[in-house]
């Protein structure tokens, strides 16, 4: 009955309502200007389709505030920052008092003094019904860059931008959503960037900003938590911006698309939308050969892991730019291609426009003028550094160069039965000079035109910033991601950012990540596949059968459940393909993104503006995959009538589904029964094998001390349409812990939608170790069914002291310490622990490390506000001396993985570095010393060790100190501390 009703309701079309219904007005009304004692007011009247707005221009200190319906919706920055800013002589200046103005032919011209003597701002503001143009420049003062600055809070939340560079590791492991909830520091934001970016931002108050420039920008949003948005163009030329003022964010997006253009086609085929692309990169990185690739394809084929293409990524060439096979690793490429085709896959290759200086083709390209020339000396080729060495770049503006390169590609494809290509490249570099008659921005267009000649096999191409890129309809793949939960979450919000700047055919980075980090865990890999199954396309690499850990060189085997659940995600996506293909056709008509934030469809739903782990896939499907640990989640449903595809129930929104069941085999998804395509979506997504109940344990991160009681709550919920019986709640605890229930732990039955809530007083063992401990809430029902949820309870240390023979020392005033058996804790501030500063807290053993020594410890956990916070182990001749000699540290940073740093000249400053990768805990750290040779190792399990780096430390002499160190590295976060917990510290000498 419920399904029949749902399908009937699906025939009713949905309507998107604006935030503010525009008043009806005379369509012939024109903007006008009025003046008061301290302001100019520009009024743009409402029309049948636009809400109207007011621009209030403060004249005492030039500031621009945009208002709609009597409320401010966007305001420039004030105070010392200034809204209209420019840099001159290395110092920032801004516009001040308006000294003159004129309103003529629909343009408001302003003249303003500035904080720099002899410099004047000239601004022109041109209002129309749904936007205004703001152009301005500086006369006098010799500026070298101009910028707009806004008070972020004046416009609510901010979105757009594309792939954002952030101090927290973006775009690889971080993508704040909304942007103002994080920090964006994007200093090379320009048309030649490898990142998928466009100079467009929009807000929850339905305003938007587009900067019209072909120059590099410096963009900062909430840098250092300053609450400002600074959009700086690194040029003295006229600053050109469009400010959109609409009723909803979707209408702002549509106005923007009206300028830059919508896709004229989709470069991906139906099959490429329906099935994954399997690319070799994250499976092998550069350690790939013919045998490995064929084994990979065979495993996928034999395990029913469907896909349309096997794509061979980097390291097949004899040298970069040769476009010839490495005969050692690929002795029979044509035979390999045939075997891949025989398994039912297409075959593709990775290519680039970089030609390395030592390649066979480089000199030929130089001799024939095929390469971009150097910007500083146009008589010589431009040499650039990329991730595989030093290279030149083919000049696509040279018809002969393009013909030569394209001819080589097509011959390669013909000779070896290659069906398509993955272009992984930049088409221009800021170090190079555009060909005469061209600009830097033209190279994005030229790259687009080149790529459009080939089947891109669902890998698309990373072009942006111009109308050609928007109109080409390429699939957009993300920048390389890490392999942890943070990267999975970033892959979702990054797609929302990319698709809402005008690139609608999005896919995440390779499922499981591809950033050269340890192999993804089973849970991350499965959850990523589930998430991707509810996106327009699936882009895969890491095999759920087995893969290789690039950090250790070890093989990683996944279990059968991993294979089964990954296959299930592929099948779900294939079933959903007819619905997705319908959305592709709709996008070609409207330009609207397929994957989009909830508030595009539900602009009146305030909660939708901050949801980070849900999205709409077309108008009917709300995707809410689980993107973190645990087996439950809270799902936000906007207003409407929603069909739960997992349980067959109908739910009326708005509603928050707390503790929604999401065990590893379940992907939460809901269908808007009044939306177009609802029936097709239900047919694809409806399941009959999902557990009826869930259990939620909260809080999700309880904290306590050894032997100190705390409370948790378990809440069992029946999500099905029938009653469940014989319900029993329980709590599984670590050894030595106890729990007492207050309230019922059993129920004879729970009706549909019913809950059983139990509060538990949990007491850790008196000697419970510091760090995380699993607490698992379980519920059994209907005698044989069981569901569970797990949280990590943190047992915290309390500052105290350490016992002999351990000593402490600090180069920061706020260091504190504790010891509990073989565990240690350090609380410390400190601006940095490298180079210019050496501020830290230390627990150490004096004169314990000989000339041949191994120092080892487990870093249990670390917690700091600063993403640069550091904790680990150290060696030195004397850890208490400023000029230590023999000084080396191996630390884990809060966000940026491992750092092995040494002092090369004995002055006490750490000045050499190795490391990187992802941050993980617990981390096993090891430093070995052999005379002046130091080597650093790290491990996740204390069994398989990876070498981080080796360094010579000439000042190492005699027996030295060794210990555990921590520094908040808080130079950008003044006053913040780090808390680090260690165990298993040892020295063998």
List each model region and its residues.
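Short acidic/proline- and small/hydrophobic-mixed sequence motifs that coincide with surface turns
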Residues: 631-633, 722-726, 772
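Short glycine/proline/serine/threonine-rich loop/turn segments at secondary-structure transition edges
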Residues: 766-775
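Catalytic and substrate-binding clefts that recognize carbohydrates or anionic sugar/phosphate headgroups
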Residues: 30-31, 35-270, 298-299, 661-673, ...
């Amino acid at each position: 009955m419920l399904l029949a009703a749902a399908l009937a309701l699906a025939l009713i079309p949905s309507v998107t309502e604006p935030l503010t219904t525009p008043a009806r007005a005379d369509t012939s009304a024109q903007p006008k200007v009025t003046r008061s004692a301290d302001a100019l007011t520009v009024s743009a009247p409402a029309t049948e389709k636009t809400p109207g707005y007011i621009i209030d221009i403060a004249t005492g200190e030039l500031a621009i505030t945009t208002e709609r319906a009597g409320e401010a919706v966007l305001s420039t920055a004030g105070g010392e920052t200034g809204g209209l800013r420019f840099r001159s002589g290395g110092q920032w200046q801004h516009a001040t008092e308006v000294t003159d103005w004129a309103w003529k032919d629909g343009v408001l011209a302003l003249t303003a003094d500035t904080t720099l003597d002899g410099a004047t701002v000239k601004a022109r503001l041109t209002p129309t019904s749904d936007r205004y143009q703001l152009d301005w420049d500086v006369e006098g003062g010799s500026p070298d860059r101009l910028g707009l600055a806004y008070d972020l809070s004046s416009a609510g939340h901010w979105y757009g931008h594309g792939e954002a560079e952030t101090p927290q590791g973006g775009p690889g492991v971080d993508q704040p959503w909304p942007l103002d909830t994080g920090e964006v520091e994007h200093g090379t934001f320009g048309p030649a960037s490898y990142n998928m970016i466009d100079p467009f931002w929009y807000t929850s108050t339905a305003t938007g900003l587009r900067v019209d420039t072909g120059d590099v920008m410096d963009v900062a949003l909430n840098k250092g938590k300053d609450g400002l948005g600074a959009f700086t163009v690194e040029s003295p030329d006229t600053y050109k911006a469009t400010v959109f003022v609409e009723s909803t964010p979707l209408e702002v997006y549509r106005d923007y698309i009206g300028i830059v253009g919508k896709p004229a086609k989709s470069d991906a085929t139906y099959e490429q939308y329906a099935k994954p692309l399997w690319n070799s990169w994250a499976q092998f990185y550069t350690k790939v050969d013919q045998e490995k690739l064929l084994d990979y394809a065979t495993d996928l084929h034999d395990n029913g892991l469907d896909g349309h293409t096997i794509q061979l990524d980097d390291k097949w060439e004899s040298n970069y730019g040769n476009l010839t096979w490495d005969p050692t690793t690929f002795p029979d490429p044509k035979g390999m291609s045939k075997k891949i085709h025989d398994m039912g896959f297409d075959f593709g290759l990775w290519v680039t426009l970089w030609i390395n200086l030592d390649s066979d083709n480089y000199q030929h390209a130089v001799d024939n003028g095929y390469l971009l020339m150097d910007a500083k000396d146009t008589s010589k080729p431009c040499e650039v550094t990329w991730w595989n060495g030093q290279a030149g770049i083919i000049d696509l503006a040279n018809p002969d160069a393009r013909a030569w390169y394209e001819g080589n590609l097509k011959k390669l494809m013909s000779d070896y039965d290659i069906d398509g290509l993955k272009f992984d490249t930049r088409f221009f570099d800021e170090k190079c000079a555009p060909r005469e008659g061209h600009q830097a921005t033209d190279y994005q267009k030229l790259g687009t035109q080149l790529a459009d000649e080939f089947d891109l096999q669902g890998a698309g191409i990373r072009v942006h910033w111009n109308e050609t890129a928007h109109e080409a309809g390429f699939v957009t793949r993300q920048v390389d991601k890490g392999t942890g939960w943070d990267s999975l979450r970033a892959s979702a919000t990054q797609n929302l950012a990319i698709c809402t700047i005008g690139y609608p055919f999005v896919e995440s980075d390779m499922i499981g990540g591809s950033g050269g980090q340890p192999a993804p865990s089973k849970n991350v890999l499965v959850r990523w596949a589930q998430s991707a199954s509810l996106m327009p396309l699936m882009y895969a690499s890491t095999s759920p059968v087995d893969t290789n850990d690039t950090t250790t060189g070890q093989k990683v085997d996944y279990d059968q459940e991993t294979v089964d659940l990954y296959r299930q995600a592929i099948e779900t996506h294939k079933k959903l393909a007819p619905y997705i293909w319908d959305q592709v056709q709709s996008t070609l008509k409207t330009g609207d993104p397929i994957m989009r934030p909830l508030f595009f469809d539900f602009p009146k739903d305030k909660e939708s503006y901050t949801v980070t782990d849900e999205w709409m896939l077309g108008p009917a499907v709300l995707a809410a995959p689980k993107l973190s640990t645990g087996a439950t989640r809270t799902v936000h449903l906007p207003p409407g009538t929603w069909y739960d595809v997992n349980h067959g129930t109908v739910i009326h929104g708005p509603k928050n589904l707390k503790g929604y069941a999401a065990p590893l085999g379940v992907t939460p998804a809901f269908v808007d029964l009044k939306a177009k395509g609802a029936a097709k979506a239900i047919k694809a997504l409806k399941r009959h094998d999902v557990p009826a109940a869930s259990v939620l344990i909260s809080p999700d991160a309880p904290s306590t001390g050894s032997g100190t009681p705390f409370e948790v709550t378990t809440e069992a919920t029946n999500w099905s349409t029938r009653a469940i019986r014989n319900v029993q709640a329980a709590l599984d605890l670590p050894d030595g812990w106890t729990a007492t229930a207050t309230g019922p732990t059993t129920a004879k039955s729970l009706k549909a939608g019913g809950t059983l809530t139990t509060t538990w007083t949990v007491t850790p063992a008196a000697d419970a170790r510091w760090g995380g401990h699993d607490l698992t809430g379980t519920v059994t029902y209907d005698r044989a069914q069981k569901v569970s949820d797990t949280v990590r309870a943190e047992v915290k240390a309390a500052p105290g002291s350490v016992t002999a023979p351990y000593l402490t020392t600090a180069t920061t005033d706020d260091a504190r310490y504790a010891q509990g058996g073989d565990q240690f804790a350090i609380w410390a501030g400190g601006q940095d622990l490298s180079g210019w500063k050496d501020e830290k807290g230390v627990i150490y053993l004096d004169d314990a490390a000989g000339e041949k020594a191994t120092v080892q410890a487990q870093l249990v956990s670390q917690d700091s506000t600063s993403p640069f916070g550091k904790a680990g182990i150290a060696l030195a001749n004397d850890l208490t001396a400023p000029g230590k000699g023999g000084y080396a540290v191996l630390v884990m940073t809060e966000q940026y993985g491992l750092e092995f740093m040494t002092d090369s000249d004995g002055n006490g400053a750490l000045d050499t570095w190795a490391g990187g990768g992802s941050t993980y805990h617990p981390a096993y750290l090891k430093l070995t010393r052999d005379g002046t040779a130091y080597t650093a190792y790290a491990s996740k399990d204390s069994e398989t060790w990876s070498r981080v780096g080796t360094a010579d430390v000439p000042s190492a002499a005699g027996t030295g100190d060794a210990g555990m160190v921590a520094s908040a590295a808080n130079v950008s976060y003044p006053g913040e501390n780090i808390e680090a917990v260690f165990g298993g510290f040892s020295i063998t000498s």
